[in-house]
Amino acid sequence: MLYISGARLVGDEQVRIASTKIDGIGPKKAIQVRYRLGISGNIKIKELTKYQIDQIEQMIGQDHVVHWELKRGERADIERLISISCYRGIRHQDGSPLRGQRTHTNARTCRKLIRK
C-alpha cells in the first residue's frame, strides 16, 4: 500500500488504474504522467521503485491541482455563493438540493443529517 498526494493506492493494481484514485487525476492525466516518466502500462504499484514513486509525486505536485488544493477551491466557491446570498448559497446553508430536485418526498435524509 502506498500514499501519493493523500490517496491510498493498493499495491496489486496497475499504475494506470491506481493513479486515477488520486483526487484531480483522471484517466487521461494518468496516461500523460505515465508516458512522461516512461513507466509501462502493465506495471503494478508494488513493482515501482522508490525513485519512480518520487518522480510520480513530484510531477503530480508540479503540474496538476490535486487533493487539498481542489478541496480548498471548492470550499472557496461555496463560501462565495453563501456570502453573496444567492439562491445556491442559501440552499447550501440549508443543506437542501441545489439544482431543482424534488424535496417533498426525496432529500429527507440529507436534510436530517445537517439539522442535527
Swiss-Prot record:
Any GO MF annotation of the entry: structural constituent of ribosome
Disulfide bridges in this chain: none
Cellular-component GO terms for this entry: mitochondrion; small ribosomal subunit
Keyword flag RNA-binding: yes
Compartments where found: Mitochondrion
GO biological process: translation
Keyword annotations from UniProtKB, A to Z: Mitochondrion, Ribonucleoprotein, Ribosomal protein, RNA-binding, rRNA-binding
InterPro entries per record: Rbsml_uS13_C (IPR027437), Ribosomal_uS13 (IPR001892), Ribosomal_uS13-like_H2TH (IPR010979), Ribosomal_uS13_CS (IPR018269)
Gene3D superfamilies with a match to the protein in the record: 1.10.8.50, 30s ribosomal protein s13, domain 2
Chief place of localization: mitochondrion
SUPFAM superfamilies on file: S13-like H2TH domain
DNA-binding listed as a keyword: no
Superkingdom in the source lineage: Eukaryota
Similarity remark: Belongs to the universal ribosomal protein uS13 family.
Task of the protein: Located at the top of the head of the small subunit, it contacts several helices of the 18S rRNA.
Subunit structure, interactors included: Part of the small ribosomal subunit.
UniProt-recorded name of the protein: Small ribosomal subunit protein uS13m
Encoding gene per record: RPS13
